Amino acid sequence: MNTCIQLLILCLVTVINSENSTDNSTENTIKNETENATETELPETFENETENVSETELPEIIENETKIEALNLPQIPKQKYCRTEGQYCSRTYFHRCCGNLVCQLHGFFNGTCVQCLAERKFCIWSSECCSKRCRLFRCRKNPYVQVIPY
């Protein structure tokens, strides 16, 4: 047990000594580099860099970057597959109704675009029904709207 503790202490001491030696070496290299750099070298490098950039390069670079950014933006999909009122629809992405129109199905993926769905027609959301009430995938009569006979 004592030998294990002694080995651990020995390892810690060697690690600490190696870290101290690397710190000293890096400090020496930093001092040497700062001594080698003179005051006249720094302004010359800045002057050379500013001479290389002309005024006409910047707008071209900015224009190219904005064009590239515009290409990377998510585009709003154009509704080239949407159908108008009275046309064929299938409730799929390729044959959907435009705007607020709803597809009234007559069979399996076979329907017509209409303003709203009549009573007892197949629906998914209440907003599709004229009565604004969809229950168990069928448009239902709205009990709150009563027809008063004349």
From Swiss-Prot:
UniProt keyword Lipid metabolism, yes or no: no
Cellular component aspect of the GO annotation: extracellular region
Disulfide bonds: 116-130, 123-134, 129-139
Pfam families for this protein: UPF0506
Entry keywords, A to Z: Disulfide bond, Glycoprotein, Knottin, Secreted, Signal
Signal peptide residue numbers: 1-18
Subcellular location: Secreted
Coiled-coil region: none
Biased composition (Acidic residues): 36-49
Region of interest (Disordered), residue spans: 22-49
Glycan attachment residues as annotated in the record: 20, 24, 32, 36, 48, 52, 64, 110
InterPro entries the UniProt entry points to: UPF0506
Similarity field: Belongs to the UPF0506 family.
Notes concerning its domains: The presence of a 'disulfide through disulfide knot' structurally defines this protein as a knottin.
Protein's UniProt name: UPF0506 protein SJCHGC02381
Species whose genome carries this gene: Schistosoma japonicum
